[in-house]
């Protein structure tokens, strides 16, 4: 069974103690609190040097029946308690490989990167699949990730995994293969404006007939746009399409 050491990779450990300026950390926490107030997503700040949560929002999606303070107290033991063992092993492997990939970028580029994955959280007999996204906030003087922000929402997938590593402004991204234990570089996705409009209107709850009327196109044409959007995004449902388009910042 994995332990906490698997979540904190030695290659990301700073040799020197970061500058724990209380004003900076207080500003970070207040910013995270403000963001948590206006989003449906769970939000947390992780301190990789002290190996603890700096902040955890009170969104019940992430808490698994605990209070935010209880989760802060548990730290990454929370994952050992509430992530199924098979998913824990997946996360440990992902941590090792993702920190290695992060390390390939310089300090400025690291802060433009984010990673998205899907895994289960369990609370007693109840289990839910979440989407987890993580990006650096502060780096140490050595360029190691010191403070990171995590964002949690319900997954649009049916299974765990589906890992993607993105760098803002890049025309490529990487997906992780747990079968091959490697990152695979992929070309960025682009959609035509008509395809994006179909996704936007579908997300708003409009039917194919209503979308056709709004866009002054036939229903068959709307279905054509939707099918091409699905093919480009590699998905099979409108929920997955909207989620993937959002992740890739296409809207």
Language-model features, listed with the residues they occupy:
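Short, low-complexity N-terminal regulatory "tails/caps" that precede and couple sensory modules
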Residues: 1-22
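PAS-family sensory domain signal
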Residues: 20-76, 169-178, 183-184
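Sensory/regulatory domains in signal-transduction proteins
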Residues: 46-70, 74-161
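Short amphipathic alpha-helical boundary/capping segments
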Residues: 183-191
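The N-cap/first-turn positions of alpha helices
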Residues: 194-198
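Hydrophobic residues on short alpha-helical segments
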Residues: 199-200, 230
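Short, locally clustered residues in the helix-turn-helix/winged-helix DNA-binding domain
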Residues: 200-204, 246
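Recognition helix of helix-turn-helix DNA-binding domains
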Residues: 205-240
């Amino acid at each position: 069974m994995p332990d906490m050491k698997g979540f904190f990779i030695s290659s990301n450990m700073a040799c020197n103690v970061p500058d724990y300026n209380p004003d900076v950390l207080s500003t970070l926490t207040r910013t995270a609190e403000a963001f948590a107030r206006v989003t449906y997503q769970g939000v947390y700040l992780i301190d990789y040097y002290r190996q603890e949560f700096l902040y955890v929002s009170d969104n019940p999606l992430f808490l698994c029946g605990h209070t935010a303070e209880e989760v802060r107290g548990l730290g990454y033991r929370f994952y050992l308690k509430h992530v199924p063992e098979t998913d824990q092993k997946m996360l440990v492997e992902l941590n090792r490989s993702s920190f290695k990939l992060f390390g390939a970028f310089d300090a400025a580029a690291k802060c433009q990167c984010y990673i998205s994955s899907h895994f289960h959280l369990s609370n007693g007999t109840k289990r839910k699949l979440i989407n987890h996204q993580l990006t650096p906030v502060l780096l140490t003087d050595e360029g190691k990730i010191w403070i990171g922000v995590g964002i949690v929402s319900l997954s649009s997938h049916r299974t765990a995994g589906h890992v993607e590593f993105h760098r803002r402004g890049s025309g490529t991204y990487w997906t992780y293969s747990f079968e091959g234990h490697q990152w695979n570089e992929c070309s960025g996705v682009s959609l035509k404006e008509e395809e994006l409009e179909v996704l936007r209107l579908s997300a708003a709850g409009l039917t194919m007939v209503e979308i056709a009327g709004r866009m002054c196109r036939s229903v068959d044409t709307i279905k054509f746009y939707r099918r091409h959007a699905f093919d480009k995004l590699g998905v099979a449902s409108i929920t997955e399409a909207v989620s993937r388009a959002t992740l890739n910042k296409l809207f």
